[in-house]
Amino acid sequence: MILVGIDEAGRGSLIGPMVVAGVAIDSNFLKFLSEIGVKDSKKLTRKKREYLFGVILEYSYAISLVKAYPEEIDSENLNEITYRAMIQIIHSMSVYNPSIVTVDKVGNASAVEREIININSSPRVENNADVKYVEVSAASIIAKVVRDNIINELKKTYGDFGSGYPGDKKTVEWIKDLYSRQPTYALPIIRRSWKILQDIAPNYYIRKRDGN
């Protein structure tokens, strides 16, 4: 039985893209993946994630990735962007005729459920799916490692801005320093619609065009 798991990384980040990943895998491999430590990527060290990334690639039928960059995220509702990415992955995985497609739920996911049904699969759209289902944990790891690699490349160009999340003091200080030097130009790696910018870099802040 083929299963597909879908999850994202970087949804709440202030810097860099959101990465949505899908993994198609034979259910016979789930026990093995669980035994070697495949679980929610947030509970793993970077070294462990990178090791498991290679194992997941080896044992999966397919990996599908969709990236959403700050300009897109600043222009639309984040849930809608996430759903669109998930639907794109669902369509790309339909060739494998998955029995069940499991998605870590974000808001009202009825559109995602409909698309899963449209490819003749059973939808399993649940909160905390990345903790409960190995195939979603695998997708979480893929998304996280891919995003981490993108962040590392960005740091080579823009300097060490920490994790890129608004709760990271290093990220906040990097934004403040950048703002002190160039208050009228926000780098394209920054999500300008994040409200923290109203306090730390007000000229960078923009309201989303859809009002969200």
Swiss-Prot record:
Catalytic activity from the UniProt record: Endonucleolytic cleavage to 5'-phosphomonoester
Domain RNase H type-2: 1-206
GO MF entries: manganese ion binding; RNA binding; RNA-DNA hybrid ribonuclease activity
Binding annotation for a divalent metal cation: D7, E8, D104
Co-factor: note: Manganese or magnesium. Binds 1 divalent metal ion per monomer in the absence of substrate. May bind a second metal ion after substrate binding.
NCBIfam families, sorted: ribonuclease HII (TIGR00729)
Subcellular location per the Swiss-Prot or TrEMBL entry: Cytoplasm
Species for this entry: Sulfolobus acidocaldarius (strain ATCC 33909 / DSM 639 / JCM 8929 / NBRC 15157 / NCIMB 11770)
PANTHER family given in the database record: RIBONUCLEASE, RIBONUCLEASE H2 SUBUNIT A
Keywords of the record: Cytoplasm, Endonuclease, Hydrolase, Manganese, Metal-binding, Nuclease
Family to which the UniProt record says this protein belongs: Belongs to the RNase HII family.
S-S bridge residues: none
Record-level GO cellular component terms: cytoplasm; ribonuclease H2 complex
EC numbers on record: 3.1.26.4
Record function comment: Endonuclease that specifically degrades the RNA of RNA-DNA hybrids.
Record's protein name: Ribonuclease HII
